[in-house]
Amino acid sequence: MTLDVSRQDPRYNTLKHGFNLRWPSTDAQAAGRIALCEKADDVAPALQHIIDTGMRPTVRSGGHCYEDFVSNNPDGAIVDLSLLNAPEVRADGTVRIPAGTQNWNGYLELYKRHNLTLPGGSCYSVGAGGHICGGGYGLLSRLQGLTVDWLSAVDIVTVDRQGRAAPRTVDATRDPELFRACRGAGGGNFGIITAYTFARLPEAPREVALATVAFDWAAMTPERFAELLRLYGEYWETRGKDPDTWGMFSLLKLTHRSAGQIVMLTQFCNPDGTCRDLSVLNDFLARFRACAPVPLKGRPPGYGPAHRQGVGQLLCSKPHTVVRYDWLTATQTVNGSGPNQRGKYKSAYMKRGFTAREAQRIYTHLTRTVPGIDLSQSLLQVDSYGGAVNKTERIADTAVPQRASVMKLQYQTYWTSAADDAGHLRWIGDFYRDVYGTPDVSAPHAGTPYPGDRYEGCYINYPDVDMLAYPFWPQLYYGDGDLYAFLQRVKRRYDPNNIFHHAMSVRP
C-alpha cells in the first residue's frame, strides 16, 4: 500500500523537506505530494502513477541529500522509501538491506542477530538507498572497504522507453552494466533502488578504542597549524598505508576559530577486531605532541547523545582521552547527525599530504570573519582514507574510481536563518576556490581538486552544484578515464526518457 501525502495533509509540512532545511527553497518549489511506500512491491505502481499523471519523480530514503535534488520538485512527487527499513538475513546467508534502512537501525539488526556489520557511515539517520549507491564509507572502511565493495545484487525499478515502470534484480550476470553503475554512481540516475543484497558481510569488531584530542585555537599559530596538518597528512601518506594500521580511522575536525578548539577523533582496532595491542594508536597520537594537544572541552563535535565515558574502559585521560568500548557501544557513541539546519558542503580526495601553501590558505579562511555571520559551526573535516578502500581491482567492477587517496575532505558550514545564506555560501565558496588555486592546480582546473598527482576529485555523495560552473565537472566526480562515458551508456539504455534527473545526474 502507498500512503499519499498531499499539500492538504497535516504531515505535509514535515515530510516535504529532508535534513538540509535549505530545501525546498520556497513553498512553491516543494513537491506537490509525497508517496510513502510501505512495501517494495508498492514502488513500481506508485512510480507508474506519477509518470502517467505527468509528474516528475524524485526519491528519498533517509532524506540527507545535500543539494536540491529531491525536495525542490515543483508539481512533482517524492517517492519516500523510509518505511522499507527491515534488514533480513536469508536462509542462504545472504543479507538484504532495504533502501529505507537508516545506518543505526541497520547496524543494530545485523549485529544483534548475526554479529555482522557494513562499513558504512557514522551518521545514524542516513538512509541506505542513497548512501550505498553513492559509494558510502565509514569508520571501518580502511579495514573493510566501501559498502559497494561488498554488494552482490540490487533491486531497482526502471522505466522503459514506453514509460512502463518495472522492477528488476541486477547483479554481475543480470544487467551487469546497470549493477556496476549502482555501485557508486550516486542516486537519482537510473531508477529507484528498493533494496541491496550482500552475499556476505564482515563480522563486527569485538571492541574498539576511541581517542579524542583537542588543540586550542587560542594557542594555534599559523606555524603550529601547518605542523598539525603536515603531521596528519604525512602519517596517512606513509605509515597509514601499512595493513596493521587499517583498523584505525581518524577525523580531524578543523573548526572555525570561533568554535574554540580543533578536535581529532580516532577509532582503532587491530585487524583481528580486538584492542589487545594499542601500539599503532599510541604511536599515531604521540606524533602530535609538538602541536600542544589539550583535553577536550565538552562533547566532541559529531558525537551522538550517547557519548558517555562511563560505559567504556578509560585507558588514558591526558592530554588525549582513550576509551575502550565494545564495538556497538562505540558506534552508538559517535552516531551523531546533528540538528536539522541549513547547510552547504564541498569535498575533495587527497592522494598526498598537505603542502605548506594549502595549510596557509586553510588557516586563513578558518580564522577570518564575515560581518554578521556566525561561523562557529563551520569546519573542514579531514577523514583518513585508503587502506582496504584502495584495492585497484575495484575500479573495474564499481563506479568509484577514487582508489588512490589517503584523505577525504568535507567542507561544511551550518546556520539557521535564510537571511544568512549568502554569507555562508560566499565564505565556503571562497575557502574552497582558494585552497585549490594555482600553482597547486593547473590553470584550466584552478578552483577544483581535479584528478592528478595530488588530488582525486570529489565525492558524489557530497554533491556540490557549484562544480557545474566547470565543463569538466563529471571528471571531478567520476575520474578522467572512461567511467562517465560508461555511465552515460547505462543511462541511455535503462532510463531512455531521462525520467530520473537532477542538476548533477548522469547526462543521457
Curated annotation (Swiss-Prot):
GO molecular function terms attached to this record: FAD binding; oxidoreductase activity
Cofactor note as given: Binds 1 FAD per subunit in a bicovalent manner.
Cross-link (6-(S-cysteinyl)-8alpha-(pros-histidyl)-FAD (His-Cys)): H64-C123
Required cofactor names: FAD
Enzyme class: oxidoreductase
Ranges of residues in domain FAD-binding PCMH-type: 26-203
Annotated EC: 1.1.3.29
pH dependence of function: Optimum pH is 7.5.
Catalytic activity: N-acetyl-D-glucosamine + O2 + H2O = N-acetyl-D-glucosaminate + H2O2 + H(+); N-acetyl-D-galactosamine + O2 + H2O = N-acetyl-D-galactosaminate + H2O2 + H(+); N-acetyl-D-glucosamine + O2 = N-acetyl-D-glucosamino-1,5-lactone + H2O2; N-acetyl-D-galactosamine + O2 = N-acetyl-D-galactosamino-1,5-lactone + H2O2
SUPFAM superfamilies: FAD-binding/transporter-associated domain-like
Keyword annotations from UniProtKB, A to Z: FAD, Flavoprotein, Oxidoreductase, Thioether bond
Pfam families: BBE, FAD_binding_4
Superkingdom assignment: Bacteria
Protein family per UniProt: Belongs to the oxygen-dependent FAD-linked oxidoreductase family.
Role played: Catalyzes the oxidation of a range of monosaccharides in vitro, displaying the highest activity with N-acetylglucosamine (GlcNAc) and N-acetylgalactosamine (GalNAc), with a reduction of O2 to H2O2. Acts upon the C1 carbon of the GlcNAc or GalNAc molecule, producing the corresponding lactone, which can spontaneously hydrolyze. Its biological function is unclear, but its main function might be connected to extracellular production of hydrogen peroxide to compete with other organisms through oxidative stress, or support the action of peroxidases and peroxygenases.
Protein name, entry field: N-acetyl-D-hexosamine oxidase
Organism: Ralstonia solanacearum (strain UW551)
Lineage, highest ranks first: Bacteria, Pseudomonadati, Pseudomonadota, Betaproteobacteria, Burkholderiales
